[in-house]
Amino acid sequence: MNRPLRIGIVVGELSGDTLGEGFIKAIRARYPDAEFVGIGGPKMNALGCQSLFDMEELAVMGLVEVLGRLPRLLKVKAELVKYFTANPPDVFVGIDAPDFNLRLELSLKQAGIKTVHYVSPSVWAWRQNRIHGIAAATHLVLAFLPFEKAFYDKFNVPCEFIGHTLADSIPLASDKLAARQLLGLDEQRRWLAVLPGSRGSEMKMLAEPFIATCQKLQARYPDLGFVVALVNAKRRAQFEQAWQQVAPELNFVLVDDTARNVITAADAVMLASGTVALECMLLKRPMVVGYRVNAFTAFLAKRLLKTPYVSLPNILAGEELVKELLQDHCTVDNLYHEVSRLLESDNQALMDKFTEMHQWIRKDADQQAAQAVLHLIQK
């Protein structure tokens, strides 16, 4: 190849920007003059990715919001198709943002451009018929988790398991003492990390039962401290309101930060379901997962979900390593019972299992992604 390698790339949110940054660096390690064009976030643009539109154009959540922005989203998609068909890249990589990227990938694949979708949508869990749309739109899917590849293999859709970037960024052993010093927590006390969710809807459902559980735990374990991770000022305000209503006499240490340091500092964790459960597993902390959604969403989920578990540690292990208390089971009594059980066990067998699972998914995902994409280009 006499000209520089040209890769089309589109991300739709900050998590995708971080993946894109790692991917660009891994490609550039082999092809220093490689060019990237499409839609990047701040980290990708700092590496010289040429953004034809602002990433914020794609960062919309929720049905109503998406409908309001639909004409603009369709225009952005049409402009990208026009650009890439006039200037064909060696490959196009859509990172996450499946509602936008899979439609774009389909158009580009039909125009004869090789397409990769990086981060599998949760097709293995619900709406499994989406697999056919993914097969039509892509030449290759890059998946974080081994059971995702197994699902694609079943349908003969090309997929590479590249490992999980979180497993790469989190060390195999985490330093509880250093995290406590960083957060200014008493090093001698026992601490429970309380993570009632990063979304407003989660906080609304979980803050009160989580706080009431802490109230009950405090009566039994007077030495137990409670540290809460809050992703932004809105979640902090929501939590503080629930705190004043339920148990104003309790002491909580509120941390405006990502969950990682809070989990690392803790002896046990009570959390909302989500990626944070995987992070907790990788940090080797015993946890209880609590989750509530509104009745209609729960009704739909019951019918659509194809997995027996909702938390990633359990899905990955294929067994209930972590207690999941969902909907009507997410009560103060049940949460209290399960957290007490963790506080009174040494949990060593569970920690050993978490370490083994960490090693399963720690493969240097950036390098694996770059290798898989370069292999596809050379085919």
UniProtKB/Swiss-Prot annotation:
Its EC number is 2.4.1.182. It comes from the Bacteria. It catalyses: a lipid X + a UDP-2-N,3-O-bis[(3R)-3-hydroxyacyl]-alpha-D-glucosamine = a lipid A disaccharide + UDP + H(+). GO terms for cellular component: membrane. GO terms for molecular function: lipid-A-disaccharide synthase activity; phospholipid binding. Pathway: Bacterial outer membrane biogenesis; LPS lipid A biosynthesis. Belongs to the LpxB family. This is Lipid-A-disaccharide synthase.
